[in-house]
Each structure stands twice: as C-alpha cells, then as structure tokens.
C-alpha cells in the first residue's frame, strides 16, 4: 500500500506485522500490533503518535506492507525474524555474534597459564577451565593484574616458553616461578595454580585480610607509598570480582531490566544477579529507535536471551509486557518467570536498573551520541547521517604510509567496518595520499556509501575531498573537515575550525560545543587507528629481509639467516649471539641492535 493511497478501511482490524519502506524498497521499520488498522492509522494522525522518531520515519516512508497472523505471539515471533532479516534502521537489533569476557586456563599444556578470552559459550571442558563471564574486558585485565601480583604463574606464550633459555624479568620481580627453565617443580607450580583457581572461584577473603593487615602495618610505620599500593590492590580485587551481596532480595538467579529514553536516544540496562550476588550491569544504547516501549522491550528480550548461555529463573521488567507465551519462547523446558513488581525489593532492583541506564545515557552514551539538532542548526544538515566515515593517514617522512577510515554507524563506532589502505610511493604528499585513499574507497562497491565524511585536515583537505568526489560523480555526501590546532595539537582545542559547504573559510565553534567535541572524538579515533596501523606496517616491514640496513649486504644477510632461520629471529638476537656471526663488525652489530630497538618501540 502506497502511503498516498492510505485509508483506514483498507487495513483489517486484525493482529499482524507491518513493514514501512522507502522509495527504493528498503525496509525502514517493522512493527507488530493486535489491531493493524488502529496502529497504522496513528501514523497518519497529527496527534496520533507522540514519539519523536516518527516524523523522521514518515518523511522517508512511501509504502507500507502488512502481514496478517492469528495472534500477538505469532506477531512477536514474525516481527523478530523479519528484524533479523532486514536490519531496519529504526528497530532495535542486537548482534548475534555477542561474546563474553572470560578467563580461561588451558589444561593441554603441562605448565598452564591464565588467559583473557572472549567466547560465546561460558562452559568448561576437559581441555580448559573457564571463569566468568565478567562485566568487561577491563575487569578481566584487572583480575589478571591481581593474579600476577599474588600468584607467580607464567604469562608468556607457548612458543616463547619453549624457546627461552634463561628466566625473564618477571622472575626477578618475583612474579613468575620460571618453569620455562625448570626453576620450580610441577608440584609447586600446580599448588600455585590451585590457589589462583580458588581466588577466581571467589575465595578472596584470605588475600583481603592480608592486604588489610599490610595496609595497617605500612601506615603505622609511616610507609604511606607502600600502604597506598596495598590499598589500590585491595580495590582492584573488590572491583574486579564485582560480587556485592544483595541478600535482601532473596533471589538466586535474576535479571532486572531498566529502560531510559530521552529524545532520540535509548539505553537498556540489564542487571545480573547470580546466587544472590550482583555480578554487574550491561548497557545497550540505541539511536533513532521508533518502537514503542513495550515493542522495544519484547524485541530486546527475544534477541538478548537468544545469545545467553544461561537464562535466569526470573526476569524483572519495568512494566508488564502482556505476552503470555514469551517465557516459553525463551526456554521451553524451564521458562523463566517474567514480572513487573510495583513494590518491595523487586521494585528497588528495577529502580537500580533504571538509574544505571540513565547514568549510562548521561555519561558514556551522551558523550558519543551524534548531536543532530546542533548539526542541523549549524551545518544545515538535511537528513540524519546514519553512516559517517572519518579519514586520516600516517607516515614517517613519506615511508610506510597508510590511509584509514573509521565508521560511526547506528550511534556508535563500528570497528568491524574500519578499513586500511597501503598508500603507494607515488603519493608524494598528504593531499595526493588523501586523493588516493578516497579514490580507492569510493571505487569499491563492497561497502555502503556514507551520508557524511569527516576529514582530519583543513581547507586544502576539504577542497581535495570535494574535487575527488566530484570526479567520481558522487553527490549527496556531506563533507566536513576539522583542522588541527596549528600551535599545539595536544593543548587547547578552542582554535580548531570546521570546514564545510556553507563555511568554506571555516567556522570556529566554542570548546563546549557538542558538535565540535563529537567531530574531535571521531578525528582522534581515526588518528589512533591510523597510527596503530602505521606502526604495524613499519614493524612488519622492518622484519622483512629486504629491509635495508647500512653495512649489511647480501653476504652478511645470508649468514644471519643461516644462523637464525628468519629475519624476525635476527631482530630478537642478543649482542653476544650476533658477535658469533663471521664478518659482522662492531658497527654492523650496533646497526642491528638499533634496528631491534626500533622494532621493540613500534610493538609497544
């Protein structure tokens, strides 16, 4: 049905699903309703739907397709399947490949080590023991740091372990038993590993007591720096374990879901309680979501718990969903109890979840949310830029040059869509390199076109981008260039300018501008990504045998490779080992050691 042909009479008053499409046939939004006629009619009434996202949606919608079903449960399932199929912009869609932060001990090695991993299934096996999931990667790293301080287990890779001939510096720091060179017995190592396992299982009271006594003793002896170190370690343990007792709730396994919406932004928070202990919170920000709260939450619950290894016995929601079959859709054998308590401890837990969602929205989410209203007002942006690409390049005096772009999509950075280009030596300056990157990017049809591109540069880069896109016959892509501060890039940013179509000479925004801060964050992320890729390329190039080193010709190179088998091992050889190579002078060895230092610095 074309929107121009809409009439309530042609829509049946039956349960079903509706798909709203644009002029190209792309599905923008998928909704469900008990009564399709009543629901769809509200979109065409001036006061029918108060959601702020609806004007954006209706402006783009040209066609509405309806699918009839027997009941609301069928509508919910069909809506969920269609959302996964079409990925509409205005619906909530969780990633199906969500993994969890865990720690794992591999049992296949005689001297096991503890690793941070990401996995879809948080289960142990004969080959490895898995602990978690933990709230974040930071929590995993914190635990590893604490384990390293208290349990001197190895941290090196299996390859490094097998080739090491003398203990590393961690042994000297008493943070490793040096099993690589048999400085400890397997029984001693196994005993230390068992203590670490007990720690990861939550038996931390002994360590905490020792730390508290150490803090008290160091303070009495006025060793305040040492006391501070013990105190920080104590806090690390408490923060990493994140097991705060909430005994008053009397729940074994429960999730509490909080929902916070403001303007175009939405945050859903899931508080996880297991065995009566609060393990942490997970936050899910969404932008431009057009679903009603009940539809949003039911869709979220279906997608979220489809990716969970274990479903809790009880799920608390901020309001009743009135979908009787929903628990059985999540787990047929052991359907969870889904309820919305209005009083008591359950209500307190829901309030806590909502407060967490609101706090997340006002801090980390808001700091990265696209300030569309300010963008529309200052840059005269016509349509919401769903996909933004930010470009930068990096090189060292023209060598090892790389160009990159990062992607901001669906109100978040999308690292999986970041791209890198090795810039040819013919691109003799920044503008030529930038032209090459843009030309190669937009000659490819594998990635969707952006609505806006942001450039790390000033007026010249902005002009170059316009010329390149014009040459490629690309229109409708807004170009914004953000100029670095001329005097000191790391200092105040108040002198930075934005260049765009309506401000070809640049506009200077106040440092408090959300729009300026948004572009700065994109620029900084692109710069970080470009530098990291440049360093990897330099490091990789330095490890190639053809890398030119003054004084090292073909004969000496062959002698080195005969001894060390690969150029990478040459870059890891000690001075004493290099001195055994026939024909190498002291100057040659000095050059090789300098090149080694360069590689090490790049890998840091």
Curated annotation (Swiss-Prot):
NCBIfam families: uvrC. Interacts with UvrB in an incision complex. Pfam families: GIY-YIG, HHH_5, UvrC_RNaseH, UvrC_RNaseH_dom. It comes from Chlamydia felis (strain Fe/C-56). One of its GO terms (molecular function) is excinuclease ABC activity. Transmembrane segments: none annotated. Residues 205-240 form the UVR domain. Belongs to the UvrC family. GO terms for cellular component: cytoplasm; excinuclease repair complex. This is UvrABC system protein C.
